[in-house]
Amino acid sequence: MAIRLYRAYTPGTRNRTVSTFSEITTDKPEKSLIVKHHFCKGRNNRGVITCRHKGGGHKQQYRLIDFKRNRHNIVAKVASIEYDPNRNARIALLHYLDGEKRYILHPRSLSVGSMVLSGPTAPIEVGNALPLSSIPLGTAVHNIELRPSCGGQIVRAAGTYAQIVAKEGTFVTVKLPSSEVRMIRKECYATIGQVGNIDASNITLGKAGRNRWLGKRPTVRGVVMNPVDHPHGGGEGKSPIGRARPVTPWGKPALGVKTRNPNKYSNPYVLRPVNRIYFIKNLMIYYYVKIYT
């Protein structure tokens, strides 16, 4: 994937970058694999906002992605590589020998015409899905299951991959893109290779309108609100938040507070948690600069 730059002939194109979409081979999705996508706009069944900053955006049709890869020992051919508006990775359309069609996440370097296979005896090639017990150490994988036969849940974003570190007993140790090291059952499936569209993180939106196209609404700082709307609000002129530490709109501590449940069931499987100190420090500096400047 390459990135296209724009000349600064308008303020909206001054810092705007977009993908060239050079890897896309067709602009029409498979009709049997798309369903209507209903936008909740951050509301629950009573119409109450439960997730702020959501709403609007372009209409989208959801592509049914095969995260389970449970068509074992049936060869499939990559028919096309397509754009998916619901994720930053590309998707690949597979045509199985028995006539079935399915979408999968497009791994890097997988091209049209390639053959992919899923199963314990599949070769170690990009796009093939195997149980973790059958994958050699040091192999890059993505779309990893956390529980057998439940479908891939982690390492699905564009450009990401995990690495097989060790095998012991009924578990396989995997190093995730966040630097977390955790154990996963050896029966869980994963796909060989790195997710494609590796330059997705280098895209610059360039203007607020592109965020609105994505269904993201503006985020207003609490310090500029009224006291009735946010604990940081109020004061005469430009004033500080008036508290010992930042809080959420509902008065709970924010920025630097651990949100993971200390009794979470998966804690014993995490051998090395994510080192969040560096990220939290930078995040707090960023928000304090926004609040006081």
Swiss-Prot record:
Gene Ontology CC, one term: chloroplast
InterPro entries attached to this UniProt entry: NA-bd_OB-fold, Rib_uL2_dom2, Ribosomal_uL2, Ribosomal_uL2_bac/org-type, Ribosomal_uL2_C, Ribosomal_uL2_CS, Ribosomal_uL2_dom3, Ribosomal_uL2_RNA-bd_dom
Assembly, per entry: Part of the 50S ribosomal subunit.
Family affiliation: Belongs to the universal ribosomal protein uL2 family.
UniProt keyword list: Chloroplast, Plastid, Ribonucleoprotein, Ribosomal protein
Highest taxon above the source species: Eukaryota
Compartments (UniProt record): Plastid, Chloroplast
One GO molecular-function entry: rRNA binding
Region spans: Disordered: 224-245
Pfam families per record: Ribosomal_L2 (PF00181), Ribosomal_L2_C (PF03947)
Any one Gene Ontology BP term: mitochondrial translation
Name of the protein this chain belongs to: Large ribosomal subunit protein uL2c
NCBIfam families: rplB_bact
